[in-house]
């Protein structure tokens, strides 16, 4: 014990990122705000997985955002002992796999290191999401109106998640 106060536990919100400033505030920023509210004993920090987005924001706007490695190194340097990494990914695809691989290198650097799951992993996740989507889009449930939900797709096997979600939505309609 060197007399320093223990660093507050950190919840690292990891997303692909976006170079659109307004969109970032209402999407990624909203998720981070919800995390702060839900976990007030944690400091919420941000990391992006897209180095291209990070570089654009730095060059264009002077905004400095860590990639996952930089964020993890900073947590070690700051003396943080407890870390929860929560990706904002929808499916467990390549981006999520990369986050898990990178973060796992730091297992021995913290007293506690946990990695959260993407939005859609098991059957209950689909049920929960469909419940939210149904409630939040109820006002559009009128004759002649169609709702289209889009995912970016991937060559990863997790792409099947989108088909499963579609099947679940059709089954519950």
Predicted regions and their residues:
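Conserved small/polar residues in nucleotide/adenosyl-binding loops
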Residues: 171-172
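A short beta-strand-loop structural module common to alpha/beta enzyme folds
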Residues: 41-51
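Short, structured motif recognition centered on aromatic/hydrophobic residues
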Residues: 11-15, 83-88, 146-150
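Glycine-rich, highly charged phosphate/nucleotide-binding loops
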Residues: 61-74
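Short catalytic helix/loop segments, enriched in acidic residues and glycine
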Residues: 28-36
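Hydrophobic, ordered structural segments
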Residues: 72-124, 130, 134, 155
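Surface-exposed interaction/gating patches
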Residues: 136-166
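N-terminal low-complexity, Pro/Thr/Ser-rich intrinsically disordered segments
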Residues: 1-10
């Amino acid at each position: 014990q060197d007399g320093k106060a223990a660093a507050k536990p950190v919840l690292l919100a990891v997303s692909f990122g976006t170079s659109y400033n307004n969109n970032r505030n209402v999407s990624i920023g909203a998720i981070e705000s919800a995390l702060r509210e839900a976990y007030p004993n944690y400091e919420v920090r941000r990391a992006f997985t897209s180095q291209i987005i990070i570089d654009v924001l730095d060059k264009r706007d002077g905004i400095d955002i860590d990639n996952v490695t930089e964020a993890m190194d900073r947590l070690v340097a700051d003396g943080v002992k407890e870390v929860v990494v929560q990706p904002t990914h929808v499916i467990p695809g390549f981006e999520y796999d990369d986050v898990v691989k990178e973060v796992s290198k730091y297992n021995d650097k913290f007293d506690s290191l946990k990695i959260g799951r993407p939005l859609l992993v098991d059957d209950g996740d689909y049920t929960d999401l469909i419940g939210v989507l149904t409630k939040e889009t109820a006002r559009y449930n009128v004759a002649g109106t169609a709702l289209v939900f889009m995912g970016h797709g991937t060559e990863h096997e997790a792409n099947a998640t989108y088909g499963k979600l579609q099947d679940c939505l059709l089954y519950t309609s």
